């Protein structure tokens, strides 16, 4: 079942209507029902366009975080053939908040790395909600250097609220791992294409979000801090998230205007 945001309620009403009409048509097929279904489907498309043409930065943040939004694993399954995952940083452990491996994209061998949030409670815990620890970033470095050795280009999918802020991560050198991974991206001898597919949260995103070409999905975000964090710091009030989201200029349009990204998808 789909999950609807508050401003998507008109779409939910129409989707429920479609479900009822299709159920009726399954039990008693008729041309008039099929015609009505077609009309309602068109109304849904029109409503989507109308709503999404004027949503606020905060609403776009909610869309970027939507539980039904495709994750890195979904993009790999849909775009990459013969994907072969690789694990571990060869120094401490495996961090499933960043996944990576080799496969073929349109017939060409590529390295794919990306944040993985998970899609349900179990997988979200397994992937630490897409918040990498130092070993995740060091794994990304290892894989990128391996790609460089074999002259293989890199595709990086960015979708994280930020690097994991736990004590253990700090003790194992979180800031150093982020800095070194960013440096690795900047100095790598093969092309890197970055795609921001959901949340681009602070240094945790920049670490694998630095590339030759940076693309960004229309309803994704990229920011130095979350609206909630900004609200609590600037206003000392967690209720100012709407104002904070607008002030942060975190949308794809904002990023394109200041040349942080190259293109909006």
Label for each model-derived stretch:
Residues 1-82, 225-265:
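Amphipathic alpha-helical segments at domain termini/boundaries
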Residues 57-60, 90-95:
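Short coil/turn segments at secondary-structure boundaries
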Residues 53, 78, 82, 92-94, ...:
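Glycine-rich beta-alpha loop segments
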Residues 158-265:
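Conserved catalytic cores of soluble enzyme domains
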Residues 70-72, 120-122, 164-166:
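Short active-site-adjacent helix-start/loop capping segments
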Residues 9, 39, 67-74, 94, ...:
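Charged, alpha-helix-enriched surfaces in structured cytosolic catalytic cores
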């Amino acid at each position: 079942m789909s999950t609807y945001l508050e401003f998507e309620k008109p779409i939910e009403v129409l989707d429920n209507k479609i479900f009822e009409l299709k159920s009726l048509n399954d039990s008693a097929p008729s041309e008039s029902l099929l015609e009505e279904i077609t009309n309602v489907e068109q109304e849904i498309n029109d409503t989507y366009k109308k709503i999404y043409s004027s949503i606020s930065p905060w609403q776009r943040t909610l869309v970027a975080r939507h539980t039904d939004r495709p994750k890195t694993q979904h993009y790999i399954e849909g775009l990459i053939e013969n994907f072969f995952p690789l694990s571990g940083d060869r120094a401490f452990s495996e961090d499933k908040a960043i996944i990576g491996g080799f496969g073929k994209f349109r017939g060409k061998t590529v390295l794919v790395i990306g944040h993985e949030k998970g899609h349900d409670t179990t997988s979200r815990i397994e992937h630490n909600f897409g918040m990498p620890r130092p070993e995740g970033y060091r794994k990304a470095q290892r894989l990128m250097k391996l790609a460089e050795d074999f002259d293989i280009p890199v595709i990086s999918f960015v979708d994280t609220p930020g690097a994991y802020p736990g004590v253990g991560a700090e003790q194992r050198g979180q800031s150093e791992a982020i800095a070194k991974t960013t440096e690795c991206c900047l100095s790598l001898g093969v092309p890197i294409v970055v795609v921001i597919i959901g949340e681009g949260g602070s240094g945790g995103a920049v670490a694998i979000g630095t590339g030759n070409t940076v693309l960004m999905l229309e309803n994704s975000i990229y920011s130095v801090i979350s609206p909630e964090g900004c609200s609590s710091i600037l206003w000392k009030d967690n209720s100012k998230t709407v104002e904070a989201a607008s002030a942060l200029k975190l949308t794809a349009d904002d990023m394109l205007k200041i040349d942080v990204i190259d293109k909006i998808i």
